[in-house]
Structures are given as structure tokens and as C-alpha cells.
Amino acid sequence: MLIIETLPLLRQQIRRLRMEGKRVALVPTMGNLHDGHMKLVDEAKAHADVVVVSIFVNPMQFDRPEDLARYPRTLQEDCEKLNKRKVDLVFAPSVKEIYPNGTETHTYVDVPGLSTMLEGASRPGHFRGVSTIVSKLFNLVQPDIACFGEKDFQQLALIRKMVADMGFDIEIVGVPIMRAKDGLALSSRNGYLTAEQRKIAPGLYKVLSSIADKLQAGERDLDEIIAIAGQELNEKGFRSDDIQIRDADTLLEVSENSKRAVILVAAWLGDARLIDNKLVELA
């Protein structure tokens, strides 16, 4: 496995792979890798000859400096996991390598609408940071496919739209959420939970599933469903942050024409803001 930290060396390797006619898959990450990331890697390996994993804690997508400062940097452990998975290339640049003149004056990519609604409304600038770094990685790695987790549902929708709008010739593969046995979605943020909070955390998925059951049973008073779910989260020890039921294909309000809904839940548990989602077919 090759570990690359600079843009010139990355470009050199990508040119070589292209000359050899290799099909390249990209898995963009911020490191602190867990089994959910390994599922993305496995999916990438199934679709391509060569897998490139990027590890970069992107300052542009953090709306709170304290979150950026405390985000775990575990490059050595991450590379050991990726080596066992037989990843071909790890791109782990410094912030200076990606943003040589800082982030304030750096050219950015914005996806209107999707970047400021829902999760974007509570995290100003977050999705602009995501779309900027992902577009830069697409330009550098020139992958044939790129794999993203469905846990970050809005992010996946945003990337798909950016790819369509910008004309990137890249197949975007969404990989289903990987869960612990008790239902908790795997996430780097779970590492912020205390042992006691970890016992409470599966309650998020239980509330999510309860909403899904109501929708599948034909209930359509969404305001009431959301209000009850928020109360249930608070009773379980969470601080409910945002609960949305949206059209899964547009992320707009559910309408009579909606065929699928996505339930999007965000809640604080101690210092960890946990997110999860679930798709529901509407009869």
C-alpha cells in the first residue's frame, strides 16, 4: 500500500494508473476509520481495479473550531486497517497541501438549496466545505467511481447533484448504513460517548423505527409524529436537535406525489451530535 502526502506524487501515480487502463475507485474520509468505512472500501474494491482512500480532516466543513480541534487524528491506525483491507493507495495530505493560502480566500464549490437546507441550516458552511473538498479530490484522483455512506443522506444527495451539475464523469455509489447489533449507526462521533451514553445511544434508532412504523401504517400527520418523536428522544436522555420527514428523492416536503420518504434525525447525547436516517416506501 502506497501512502502519498503531496499533490505532485498523487498526480504522478494517477497518470500511471490511467496509462495502465486501471479502473479507479475513491473513498473520501476524514480518518478515524471504523467498520462502516471498511464497508465503503469493500464496495469500492468490488467496483474497481484500484482503490484510493483519502484521509483529510477538512477544516472548511467544520462550523465550530472546537469540533475541528478535537476531531481524532488516527492516521497510523487508519493505515494499518486499510493495509489489511489491501487498499492500493492512501492520500493523506496536510491542510497546507490542500489549502496553501488558507481557507478564507480559497475558491469554493457551493450547491444552492441542498447546502443550506435541513442539516445545512444548523451547520452554516458545512456542506460548502464538503462539496469543495470532494470536487477537489475528484479533480486530483479522477476516479471512475466514488463511494459514500448513506448515513449522511443529505451529503450523498448533495454530491450526486454536484456531479450532475458539474459534469463529472464519475459513478456515485451509495453504501447502506452499517449498524452495531443494538441498531446504533456506526460513526466516528460514537467515540465521544461515555460508557453510559453508549447504552442510551441505540434509542435513536428505536425512535427512528417508530416513526417509520407509523408512516407505513398510513399515519400522515407529520407534525404530530415529529412532536411525539422529539419528546421520546428527550425522555430517553437525548437532546432532540432536528427531526424531518422529507421526500427521499428531492428532500423537499412530503407531498401526495411522494413515493418514498426519508426520516432524518439528529440529536445530542452529551457532547456527541448523532445523526441517523431511514427510508420508507409510501403506499
From Swiss-Prot:
Role noted for this protein: Catalyzes the condensation of pantoate with beta-alanine in an ATP-dependent reaction via a pantoyl-adenylate intermediate.
Residues involved in ATP binding: 30-37, 149-152, 186-189
Subunit architecture: Homodimer.
The organism's taxonomic lineage, starting at the top: Bacteria, Pseudomonadati, Pseudomonadota, Gammaproteobacteria, Enterobacterales
Keyword Cytoplasm attributed: yes
Name of the protein: Pantothenate synthetase
Pathway(s) of this molecule: Cofactor biosynthesis; (R)-pantothenate biosynthesis; (R)-pantothenate from (R)-pantoate and beta-alanine: step 1/1
Catalytic residue positions: 37
Biological source species: Escherichia coli O45:K1 (strain S88 / ExPEC)
Biological process, per Gene Ontology: pantothenate biosynthetic process
Subcellular location: Cytoplasm
